[in-house]
């Protein structure tokens, strides 16, 4: 089964996560098919904390990929950020 999940990177006590499409049998930080975004929980100031390539994510979902619980939460958060960033008419 193909899943979209977070793969941990970064240094000790400074996590950085890549949002990857991977086979569920592979290790968390192991081999993956495609990187579709990132999440930086320790972003400060003007740094970008979350980026998702929504076109690629919807493509993989159409192919049957399942989102992990955390990725589902982050996708909703990203949608709210995008909606808030759009200028009001």
UniProtKB/Swiss-Prot annotation:
This is Small ribosomal subunit protein bS16. GO terms for molecular function: structural constituent of ribosome. GO terms for cellular component: cytoplasm; small ribosomal subunit. Keywords: Ribonucleoprotein, Ribosomal protein. It holds the Pfam family Ribosomal_S16. NCBIfam families: S16. One of its GO terms (biological process) is translation. The gene is rpsP. Belongs to the bacterial ribosomal protein bS16 family. Disulfide bonds: none annotated.
């Amino acid at each position: 089964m193909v899943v979209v999940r977070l793969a941990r990177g970064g240094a000790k006590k400074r996590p950085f996560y890549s949002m990857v499409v991977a086979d569920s049998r592979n290790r968390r930080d192991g081999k993956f098919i495609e990187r579709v975004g990132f999440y930086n929980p320790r972003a400060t100031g003007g740094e970008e904390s979350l980026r998702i390539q929504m076109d690629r994510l919807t493509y993989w979902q159409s192919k049957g990929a399942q989102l992990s619980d955390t990725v589902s939460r982050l996708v909703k958060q990203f949608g709210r950020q995008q909606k808030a960033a759009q200028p009001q008419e």
